[in-house]
């Protein structure tokens, strides 16, 4: 297999045995980016020279016999809503097209401490609002498995980069499925940790009660490795949980015997492509074959998750995005007075989907409609959380499709926001409940990847990783790579 298609842990083993240098691995990835990113369009900002300098520094430290971090010398990339000191961070928006943060996000700092090498910043839907990466203000990213299809979103650039061999791993953010849905579309592993497991400090906020940062990797072992590096309490984020970080790699045993897995029938309803449903059911049967006990169950309020989410998330976005006014930082479009300057800046700085959600959120929070919409959505959110609590009294995990479909064609849903929102039908309830969930490849339909979603109890990421690892070790889907020849 080509060097750029190795997993992070495979590369790390080669580096530790000194069979290859970090500079060589980084140069190979930079060459790969040069060869294919003109078609995939995953990167917004490349930091090739900085990456090579960081790689040389790791090689020098290794030569001196210094103790190195678990990701030392491994090249990675970041979704462009994670603050990076001295490196442009745009959120794929005109509003922040030239913004350079003065500090690193906590997860970025932790990756640096672990020794990882940063290749650049990755395309996304503007302010993480979208399911296809077509809402980027710069350009759409393409799915490496079929360049006429979307990679999913909003972390489409991050997932496409990992799938295409343009980074060994990436970090994304997940507010309603933005790591898991594109991971399903592009055939990689994507995890949304429990809300509070990973610090949000330095993540440009979309919906603060739903956002969570997580790893995007080529296999489950890499997922465990990266999660362990970024997880843990952070005094700079009051919502981060003050709990010890487990040794996630020690949970990676190919053993699910006796594990009880619930299969919610509501996740196989209308809108589900029959072949996707069949592939996911075969994956669940494989877990059963490996010794898990799988039973059908019910999460009765699932059908209300999507409408409730599209009140809660836009309401929080309306508040969070009020800060972009042209005064302190970011885009400023002049006007005859400050009111006109605000209007010009926000109308020209935000794209159509962001404006749509700000309008919806502002409406839901307005005095005449707050009780009827926003407050009711919060009550529904409580019912959704209670459904999961009831299910987890009986089951260790839940298993569902990650997405009701395979990757759709570029432009296919761009003019139909409701059709686009339905892409996250299977992922949104997990964010509403604050639970951990993971998508991993479980098959192919029409030559396109399909994802299995595993959902766990709060802070039970180790159990998720164990079950995912057991499935992965008994199949070969995670070893398949898209055939992206060099143009």
Curated annotation (Swiss-Prot):
Protein name: Glutamyl-tRNA(Gln) amidotransferase subunit A
Subunit structure: Heterotrimer of A, B and C subunits.
Gene Ontology MF, one: ATP binding
The enzyme's E.C. designation: 6.3.5.7
Superkingdom of origin organism: Bacteria
Entry's family note: Belongs to the amidase family. GatA subfamily.
Role this protein plays: Allows the formation of correctly charged Gln-tRNA(Gln) through the transamidation of misacylated Glu-tRNA(Gln) in organisms which lack glutaminyl-tRNA synthetase. The reaction takes place in the presence of glutamine and ATP through an activated gamma-phospho-Glu-tRNA(Gln).
Disulfide-bonded cysteines: none
Annotated GO biological process: translation
